[in-house]
């Protein structure tokens, strides 16, 4: 099999990054409404700068939510509890500019419609991606970037790295081999970590601790060699962080939220949107489809696209692409998708149980690759006899299964 090598890079940002703060606040608002009113229609954007949070958007809900308390609790959880860290939940100003959902949108999307036939909340294109390079069916570049951030802030919370502050970014470059369209990680080429820190640690000590306590704890030793490059706080000191260093806005980390630059992206953000917004629910469903195909052994990589028109329930188009890693052609894979998945928004919401208040955790370390989310549970696929014959009648060894 022909093979060539290439480098690919993905990044992640921490829960204390200003944009991620806004994502978490927007999703906390969504969860607060869904907890009281599962039919709430929410489109909540958050913006932050020094000492200020602003909520803006459209919400139609029976819920009663104390936004002042909610916002401050999210900021406190993240760890911004003193102005020296760039933000303080106790003293920040919380502004609220929320209005009702447009009655024209409501009439076209959900009013007087059966729950199964709810129309798409907007037009748009959404993508799902999966790859067999990791158990999570996620790109290793992004998975490691997320894990580096998560480990860094576990150590911050435990007090083991008490000099770490909430704002950080990570980036991982991996050398891959391409094998017939599949991607095989060979080694970690470069690791970048930039973390906010207290003034009382030297850069030398900071870099040593990042290598010993974060990088070595996260990245498998067999992927690191003497040629691996480290850029640890390469700009020098990073004391001024959070919203004091940069403004934040919901929906500005859509590649971090999804596949780290792999696959494709339709442009729509997730956070702060209830599941009638197909930007969110259809992207989750597309991931569910792609992961189900990969975990069933039908292909090693998979990209799924769906598209919608506002107020129309049925997708305008569905596309499946296997990068040449399947014994089946794209038309045959599409038949399997159509036979096993109903991609109308109402059915996505029902099948994935998306009216529950589950969204704030999605805004922390990526929306995909975490098994606690329902769209990460592969569907047991029903495949007709003729297609089973073409793939040799095999059932997949990982236990997710093909039925006939």
Swiss-Prot record:
It catalyses: L-methionine + ATP + H2O = S-adenosyl-L-methionine + phosphate + diphosphate. Catalyzes the formation of S-adenosylmethionine from methionine and ATP. The reaction comprises two steps that are both catalyzed by the same enzyme: formation of S-adenosylmethionine (AdoMet) and triphosphate, and subsequent hydrolysis of the triphosphate. It holds the Pfam family S-AdoMet_synt_C. Its EC number is 2.5.1.6. The keyword Coiled coil does not apply. GO terms for molecular function: ATP binding; metal ion binding; methionine adenosyltransferase activity. Keywords: ATP-binding, Magnesium, Metal-binding, Nucleotide-binding, One-carbon metabolism, Potassium, Transferase. Transmembrane segments: none annotated. K(+) binds at residue 45. GO terms for cellular component: cytosol. Binds 2 magnesium ions per subunit. The magnesium ions interact primarily with the substrate. Belongs to the AdoMet synthase family. This is Probable S-adenosylmethionine synthase 3. It comes from Caenorhabditis elegans. One of its GO terms (biological process) is S-adenosylmethionine biosynthetic process. Protein expression is regulated by post-transcriptional regulation: under rich-diet conditions, mett-10 binds and methylates sams-3 mRNA, directly inhibiting splicing and protein production of S-adenosylmethionine synthase. Mg(2+) binds at residue 11. L-methionine binds at residues 58, 101, 246, 277. It is an enzyme of class 2 (transferase). Its cofactor is Mg(2+); K(+). Gene3D superfamilies: 3.30.300.10.
